[in-house]
């Protein structure tokens, strides 16, 4: 996950515990979490017609899961990928650390991987996970924005702003995030030209 620290040495090999909510984590407490990897497995709700509501609800575990797990002595965090599809592709995204809380490594697991892990745990198996990652945060680099402007003939002082970001995560090619957003922005501009 973007912002995660690396695993130290040869990585982590330890038991995992599964939670869906912050309340689940709290109910387990330090006694059942310490020294383990916390697996945040809250699926996105497919009933929402506006899927960003489902994403917005679950993203809290990716963003803050490592912090909350570390408060209970966890040594790592795994987060179910934020997708309605069941597939083998772990998604990336950003996460954070809080000052004064130990930093633990965090990673995403594909939705299919999450389903399989969860089933093994439900079957009563003691599941151990090997996690090794070599993350690094590099110094900031200057980047640039692409800006286009079309002045209206009528009411040119009024502004309609349309945008998307041109960067993408290193894991993918950027077609979805944010190639799709860029194409939608261009489509809006094309519609404005027609109007």
Predicted feature locations:
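Second-shell loop/turn segments in exported
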Residues: 3-4, 14-19, 50-66, 102-107, ...
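Surface-exposed loop and adjacent secondary-structure segments within mature catalytic domains
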Residues: 79-108
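Noncatalytic luminal/extracellular "stalk/propeptide" segments of secretory-pathway proteins
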Residues: 1-37, 41-49
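Solvent-exposed loop/turn segments at secondary-structure junctions
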Residues: 23-24, 44-47, 82-86, 113-114, ...
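Acidic/His- and Gly-rich active-site-bordering loop/insert found
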Residues: 110, 142-167
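A non-catalytic alpha/beta surface segment that caps or lines the substrate-entry region
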Residues: 1-18, 99-149
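Non-catalytic positions within long, well-ordered alpha-helices that form the structural scaffold/packing
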Residues: 67-73
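Alpha-helical metal-binding/catalytic segments enriched in His/Glu/Asp
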Residues: 61-62, 146, 162, 166-195
């Amino acid at each position: 996950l973007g912002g995660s620290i690396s695993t130290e040495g040869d990585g982590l090999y330890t038991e995992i515990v599964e939670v869906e909510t912050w309340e689940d984590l709290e109910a387990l407490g330090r006694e059942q979490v310490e020294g383990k990897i916390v697996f945040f497995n809250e699926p996105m709700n497919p009933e929402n017609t506006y899927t960003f509501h489902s994403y917005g609800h679950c993203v809290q575990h990716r963003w803050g899961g490592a912090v909350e797990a570390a408060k209970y002595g966890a040594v790592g965090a795994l987060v179910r990928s934020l997708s309605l599809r069941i597939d083998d592709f772990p998604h990336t995204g950003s996460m954070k650390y809080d000052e004064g809380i130990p930093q633990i490594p965090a990673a995403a697991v594909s939705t299919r991987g999450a389903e399989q892990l969860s089933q093994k745990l439900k079957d009563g198996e003691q599941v151990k996970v090997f996690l090794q990652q070599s993350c690094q945060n590099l110094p900031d680099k200057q980047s640039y924005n692409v800006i286009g402007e079309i002045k209206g003939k009528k009411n040119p002082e009024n502004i309609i702003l349309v945008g998307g970001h041109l960067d993408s995560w290193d894991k993918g090619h950027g077609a979805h995030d944010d190639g799709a957003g860029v194409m939608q922005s261009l489509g809006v501009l094309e519609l404005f030209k027609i109007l």
